[in-house]
Amino acid sequence: MRARPSITVVCAAALVFLGGCATTSDPDTASVPASVTEGKKDMPPPVAAIADDPAAPVSLTLDGVTAPTDPVATDASGTLLPPQDVSRLGWWVDSAMPGGGSGAIVVTGHVDDVDQGDGFAARFADVREGDELTVSTGDGRAREYRVDRLLSVGNEGNLPLDEINRLDGPETLLLVTCGGEFVGPPLGYANNDFVFAVPTGPAAEVPAP
């Protein structure tokens, strides 16, 4: 298991990031995001990453709507940014792998943007326990997950740091974004929203288009 510092989740006005120690080439000491922030404008570009495993996520479907999902990594300062296109999501390459059987698969995205409007991650606020999501992976498979828990924590609240960072324990799809009322800088949104979903069965082959 990789050694990882804790994550602190903070909503801020100008950008979205998961921050932590800088990425290293050693997977046992890879960087771990320290925070998540959600923004309204002036979004810097993400750090593109390469998903070496074909089982990496390529899209996520929620309520019949699909968001392309890009691998993203931390930069030298430890910042992890979702795609600037708010219709897309970012899968943190240092989190768990779909179908791996353990750990948290961390997916994040922008709630909105002043120019683009609502982002795909805004849909996370409408998710309810029992809802189903589909993660399609690069090996041509679709993995189904069922939402089993929702959590919204104020910026001053206690965050589920162990659950966000873990690579062991039950496999969990963890969607992370900001929520609640937009309160302006420096906090941005009032809350941090989490959607926890568990696998419902084995992967299925994705039909050819």
Where are the regions that the model predicts?
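Solvent-exposed, non-transmembrane regions of membrane-associated and secreted proteins
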Residues: 22-128, 137, 149-209
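Short, charged beta-turn/beta-strand-edge "cap" motif at the junction between a beta-strand
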Residues: 138-142
